[in-house]
């Protein structure tokens, strides 16, 4: 395999759920993709993909080629970026993933502004709340909020983000203010289902004191905007990120409960596949993103 384009072609197939999806990304017909893949296999003398009518399954040799090839392509792109930097610019594609709500409110505008500053960079922003493991290989930068599980990704700090227990004033008028986390177990609570986490165990600390409470949600949803809306409507107690409810707290649409007790933070980070050797366009985007959230993120700015 002498042409990097062949390796990029194979990596596109590897990162696609089906042959049809790969064909769409490549701008080719499925038959053309199959034909080129067969030519590549004949040239290498090894089977790379087991094909069926419904799915693709890479062989061990195909997986090895893609794993090591992705590293080589990354190094090659970084080299080209450095050459462009010497000429005073950079080009290429930038694939970014962000959660739905945060992406709409805080990332989409940053992406559009960055592209306007650097018109030679093509940017594809994907909003998704899929589990992180399903996303990593498809994107150059993944915006992540909260605790990061076992991962080989590199986290770049973007912004601080606390989590609050909240309820609507109408809910507080009916049920009163809880004076201890344990009191939440007897109140109607609303849970956000995401990433296969235990969403009914809420953990608090006050100084060195730690307390966990198991809530029994009367309502749950996998969409944060729905959760916030239910909370504002007085349907129950919610736990939401500071970035999501800061305006509601400021306007009085929500009231913060148990302010003396702290939930684990859910800071905003940008994840990349490596710390060093990143292509210039990724490094510059990360620097730009940090400037948009510092010295204070939008949800902590006055007014």
Question: How would you name each of these model-derived features?
Answer:
Residues 12-27:
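Short helix-boundary/capping micro-motifs
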Residues 29, 36, 110:
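Residues within the DNA-recognition helix of helix-turn-helix
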Residues 41-58, 254:
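A short LG(V/I)-centered, amphipathic sequence patch enriched
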Residues 91-151, 302:
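Central regulatory/effector-binding core of bacterial HTH transcription factors
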Residues 152-163, 167-192, 207:
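Flexible hinge/capping segments at coil-to-helix
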Residues 212-256, 263, 272:
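Hydrophobic hinge/microswitch elements
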């Amino acid at each position: 395999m002498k042409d990097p384009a062949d390796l990029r072609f194979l990596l596109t197939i590897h990162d696609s759920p089906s042959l049809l999806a790969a064909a769409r990304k490549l701008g080719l017909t499925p038959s053309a993709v199959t034909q080129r893949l067969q030519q590549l296999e004949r040239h290498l003398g090894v089977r790379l993909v087991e094909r069926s009518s419904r799915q693709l399954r890479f062989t061990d040799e195909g997986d090895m080629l893609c794993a090591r090839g992705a590293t080589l392509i990354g190094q090659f792109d970084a080299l080209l970026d450095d050459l462009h930097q010497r000429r005073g610019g950079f080009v290429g594609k930038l694939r970014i993933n962000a959660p739905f709500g945060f992406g709409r409110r805080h990332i989409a505008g940053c992406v559009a502004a960055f592209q306007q500053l650097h018109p030679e960079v093509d940017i594809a922003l994907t909003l998704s709340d899929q589990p992180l493991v399903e996303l990593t290989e498809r994107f150059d930068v993944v915006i992540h909020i909260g605790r990061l599980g076992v991962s080989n990704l590199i986290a770049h700090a973007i912004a601080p983000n606390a989590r609050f227990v909240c309820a609507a004033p109408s809910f507080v008028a009916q049920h009163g203010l809880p004076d201890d986390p344990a009191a939440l177990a007897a109140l109607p609570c609303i849970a956000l289902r995401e990433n296969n986490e235990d969403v009914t165990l809420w953990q608090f600390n006050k100084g060195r004191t730690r307390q966990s409470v198991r809530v029994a949600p009367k309502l749950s949803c996998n969409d944060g905007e729905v959760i916030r809306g239910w909370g504002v409507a007085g349907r129950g107690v919610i736990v939401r990120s500071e970035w999501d409810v800061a305006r509601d707290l400021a306007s009085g649409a929500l009231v913060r409960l148990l302010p003396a007790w702290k939930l684990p933070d859910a800071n905003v980070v940008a994840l990349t596949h490596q710390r060093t050797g990143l292509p210039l366009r990724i490094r510059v985007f990360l620097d730009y993103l940090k400037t948009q959230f510092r010295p204070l993120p939008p949800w902590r700015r006055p007014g």
